[in-house]
Amino acid sequence: MDRIRIIGGNKLHGTIPISGAKNAALPLMIAAMLSDETLILDNVPRLADVALLQRILGNHGVDIMAVGKRPGDHEYQGQTLHISAKNIIDTTAPYDLVSKMRASFWVIAPLLARMHEAKVSLPGGCAIGTRPVDLLIMALEKLGAELSIDAGYVVAKAPGGLKGATIEFPKVTVSGTHVALMAAALAKGTTIIANAACEPEITDVADCLNKMGAKITGAGTPRIMIEGVSKLHGARHTVLPDRIETGTYAMAVAMTGGEVQLSGARPELLQSALDVLTQAGVTITVNNDGIKVARNGAGISPVTVTTAPFPGFPTDLQAQLMALMTRAKGASHITETIFENRFMHVQELARFGARIQLDGETATIDGVAKLRGAPVMATDLRASVSLVIAALAAEGETMVNRIYHLDRGFERLEEKLSACGATIERISG
C-alpha cells in the first residue's frame, strides 16, 4: 500500500494549477446517462473516484473515452471525457461497486428518469456519519417513483415515467438536490425543489443540463424550478475549478509560509474560507490568473468557525483549517454542523503534538510553537490531507499511511506540492 513521506519545514513558493472539482465531475458524469447522445466533459480531474465511477457507468453500458491521458497513467483518466450512454444495458448497480463510493448511488436518478426502473445497492464511501439516503428516496417518491428496499438494494420503478412535483427538503442536502435535479429533468410537468442546496457544484450540473436541453432556473438559490422535457441531447461542458482543492492549498501555504499562485482558482466559490484565512493573518490577492496566497513573517491568528452549507464555511475544509490552527497564537474553536463523526483526524493530529479538546460538535485547538513529524494514518479523504498540511510544517519526517483516501480527491498532490518546494514523495508498496 502506498505511503507519502514528508520532511517538514520548507516554505512553499511557486504556482499550483487547480484541478476540476471532483464534487461536480462525478454528478456530471452520472447526468450523462440522461441522454442517448454524447456529453463531452473538459477539465475532469484524474482521481481514483473518477476511475471508479467510470467502471460503475460501464457496468450499465455507458461508453467513456478519456482524451489527454498522460504516459504511465493506468488508473486515472484523462482531462477530457467523451461519455455516451446511447445503450443502457443494465439498470442494476451492484454492491461491489456502489459500496466503494456513496456518490455512485446517484445513478438511480437517470436510470429511473430514462429507463423507468433501477436497482441500486445502498451506498458506501467515506465513513463520516450515517448519511442516510432517506431524503433521496423521499424526493424520488414525490416524483411518482415506487421504491422498496430488498436485501440491501433500493428497488425503484416508475412505469409511466416520473411526474413533476414540489419537493421540500427538511434540511439542506447536496445529494438530495443532485438526485432531484437529474430525475426532474425528464419528468412530465414542473418540479419545484424547495430548500435546495446552493453549492456551486449544483449550479455547474444545472448549467450542463441546460446545455443539454433541460429547462432549469434558480440553481444556486434555495428554490429551483425544473420544467421537464422529453429528451436531452449531447453537449460540451467544462467542469468548474475545485474550491476544496483551492482552500486546501491556500491553507498549506498559510501553514508553511511563502507565496503561491493558485492558477485557475475562482474566489467566489470559497469566499467564506478566504475570509477566514484573512482573519488568520494570511494575505489573499485576487488576480486574472486566480488567487495568490502569501504569509511572510506574520504568525497565524486564531479563529472561531462554524461549518455551514454554501455560502458558509465548507465542512470539506474543516480538517485542513484545524491543522492550520494547531500553529496559531492562541485558542481556536471549530464547530462542525454538517456531518457527525467528522473529527477523526484529531487523534492523528495529536501525534504531531497538537493540543485539541473535543466537546460535542466543537473542537478547541490551542496553538503550539512546534509540531513534530510522526507516523500517521489517514481515516478519510479530507482528514488525510489535513495530516499532509501538518506534516509540511512539522520538524522532521512524517509518514502518511493509507493514502488511497488522498488519491480519491486530490490530483497529483505530491507533484503539485513538490513543485513549490515541499520535500514530499510517494513510496509504493
From Swiss-Prot:
Active-site residues, record numbering mapped to chain: 126
Enzyme class: transferase
GO cellular component, one term: cytoplasm
Annotated metabolic or biological route of this protein: Cell wall biogenesis; peptidoglycan biosynthesis
Record-level GO BP terms: cell division; cell wall organization; peptidoglycan biosynthetic process; regulation of cell shape; UDP-N-acetylgalactosamine biosynthetic process
InterPro entries in UniProt: Enolpyruvate_Tfrase_dom (IPR001986), Enolpyruvate_Tfrase_sf (IPR036968), MurA_subfamily (IPR050068), RNA3'P_cycl/enolpyr_Trfase_a/b (IPR013792), UDP_GlcNAc_COvinyl_MurA (IPR005750)
Subcellular location field: Cytoplasm
Family from the record: Belongs to the EPSP synthase family. MurA subfamily.
Protein name according to UniProt: UDP-N-acetylglucosamine 1-carboxyvinyltransferase
Native organism: Rhodopseudomonas palustris (strain BisB5)
High-level lineage: Bacteria, Pseudomonadati, Pseudomonadota, Alphaproteobacteria, Hyphomicrobiales
Gene name as annotated: murA
